[in-house]
Amino acid sequence: MAGPRACAPLLLLLLLGELLAAAGAQRVGLPGPPGPPGPPGKPGQDGIDGEAGPPGLPGPPGPKGAPGKPGKPGEAGLPGLPGVDGLTGRDGPPGPKGAPGERGSLGPPGPPGLGGKGLPGPPGEAGVSGPPGGIGLRGPPGPSGLPGLPGPPGPPGPPGHPGVLPEGATDLQCPSICPPGPPGPPGMPGFKGPTGYKGEQGEVGKDGEKGDPGPPGPAGLPGSVGLQGPRGLRGLPGPLGPPGDRGPIGFRGPPGIPGAPGKAGDRGERGPEGFRGPKGDLGRPGPKGTPGVAGPSGEPGMPGKDGQNGVPGLDGQKGEAGRNGAPGEKGPNGLPGLPGRAGSKGEKGERGRAGELGEAGPSGEPGVPGDAGMPGERGEAGHRGSAGALGPQGPPGAPGVRGFQGQKGSMGDPGLPGPQGLRGDVGDRGPGGAAGPKGDQGIAGSDGLPGDKGELGPSGLVGPKGESGSRGELGPKGTQGPNGTSGVQGVPGPPGPLGLQGVPGVPGITGKPGVPGKEASEQRIRELCGGMISEQIAQLAAHLRKPLAPGSIGRPGPAGPPGPPGPPGSIGHPGARGPPGYRGPTGELGDPGPRGNQGDRGDKGAAGAGLDGPEGDQGPQGPQGVPGTSKDGQDGAPGEPGPPGDPGLPGAIGAQGTPGICDTSACQGAVLGGVGEKSGSRSS
């Protein structure tokens, strides 16, 4: 038992070795040829349109294009709508001191101010001292003054006379010259003396020296309006003052005249791609462009499925009936005629109406074929007849036998068109005949009715993207579209620097004090000051008509007491517009405005020339399709009669028939029937 168990692993190893050797000896063969294509499968149903994908990321900015040629100035556009007043910007830094401008002309007098005394003005310069005044009148005597203070001790008096001793004295007299004694103590103040008499008028004193200029007195009451003086000399420009506060926004002015269109500037760099706006309205179709140059013919695509037959068109209208031809008598069978000579080219005859069908005579013996005649000129195409009633469907015809290809004969004279026969059933399709030589190009038939939409063929391979065509010429300028709606107001840009300070104007005439109003509104000012302004203008006009004569300088009046401070004045009228400031830095990009209306469609550019791409790899073999079911298509619309075909080769001479019998009764009946129909047609 131990022997067989030990041999089992060895047998397994030998079997595995043989299997591995056999597997190594096998090699992979060459791939076989592709199998035949399977039948086409059923056309798939149209899939549901997918949802619109999210907008793609904005692409990188393209290179800056070459600057275009400046275009012709366009027509002046309609005046724009008045803009919206912008927000008040911040005051810019003061500008540099400009050169003094020319002095402006004297403006009209301003409106009088509101009631109330203004703030006192700055002290004026000291005036020139006037001439000395004359001798004034003697004033009245003044009141008695208070007792004065004791004066200082006076100088020692002169020596007194020698005194005399009184009687009984034994003393000697003092010498004549005695030394002065010491000064005595100050005496008591004396009593008020009696009032002295009024002294006489003294002499006129000399003019004193010019005193120092006194302090400026308070502003006096405003005087009446004086005459307008002559225009003074132009003063020196004052120093540049600090920038004033920004005044209130002025009233909106009338829209200005649109200026001439400027030259087209250089093309700027492409900005960031904006958000996709809503779909605009369909624009008006533009003018038809010039036909483009035909591109090279592309490679034939995959053949599509046969479309369904079109709806049968309406039958053409029945043509005018031809004039009745004289019915010929039925003759006996003629002998074979001699070959006739080639007839000369006949003139083009008028197209006659179709005659009535005569009774078919017995077949005569075929004549000897004559020489082929000269081909006649091609007749003009007749008018298309109106659509007639649809006839009943005839029985299906027997399948024809495939004929041999004949030689192309010369074109014969056009035959008279026969009457339109009844429409027969669609016959079975016979075997395809051999392709004949290409005939002469026939007259173009009228466009048939459009057929039903054929089944969708299999989608072809996607060709390579052709190169973009050259840019078309600039089309004519379209008519100006309606003005678009104004966009959203953008963020106000930073304020520009302050403009140069203008030359101070000539001070106007001081107006009369107005009546203090309750409200300093514009309407209130107009109501209060309308008449006063008219009166001031009338007075000014009257004074201007008079000759100007400088008046004498009046005496300065006494300085009045300072008046109480008046109420603050109302906001003045907006001043004249200053010069334009420097251009500020470019503002930030605003939000994209609403999408404008779609413009007119431009002219169609020239067709681009496509390039044939490289042939693609052969695709994998499709799955086996389901065999399709064939359906007979609908009959197509009958086309217009084509040009007469080439005459065929003369046929073989047939067997001679039996002699016929001439029966004139049928001919007479045909004649009578034709005359009756002719008269009936005329009467109708």
UniProtKB/Swiss-Prot annotation:
Compositional bias of type Low complexity: which residue ranges?
Answer: 66-82, 221-237, 498-507, 570-586, 617-628
The record's section on InterPro entries has:
Collagen, Collagen_superfamily
Composition bias of kind Pro residues appears in 31-42, 55-64, 140-161, 177-188, 558-568
Q: Where is this region: Nonhelical region 3 (NC3)?
A: 520-550
Indicate which residues are glycosylated according to the record: 483
Give GO MF terms, alphabetically: extracellular matrix structural constituent conferring tensile strength; protein homodimerization activity
Task: Identify the stretch(es) annotated as Triple-helical region 1 (COL1).
Answer: 633-661
Region Disordered: start-end pairs: 26-521, 548-665
**Segments for region (Triple-helical region 2 (COL2)):** 551-630
Name the associated disease, please. Answer: Multiple epiphyseal dysplasia 3: A generalized skeletal dysplasia associated with significant morbidity. Joint pain, joint deformity, waddling gait, and short stature are the main clinical signs and symptoms. Radiological examination of the skeleton shows delayed, irregular mineralization of the epiphyseal ossification centers and of the centers of the carpal and tarsal bones. Multiple epiphyseal dysplasia is broadly categorized into the more severe Fairbank and the milder Ribbing types.
Subunit note: Heterotrimer of an alpha 1(IX), an alpha 2(IX) and an alpha 3(IX) chain.
Protein name per UniProt: Collagen alpha-3(IX) chain
Could you tell me which species this protein originates from? Homo sapiens
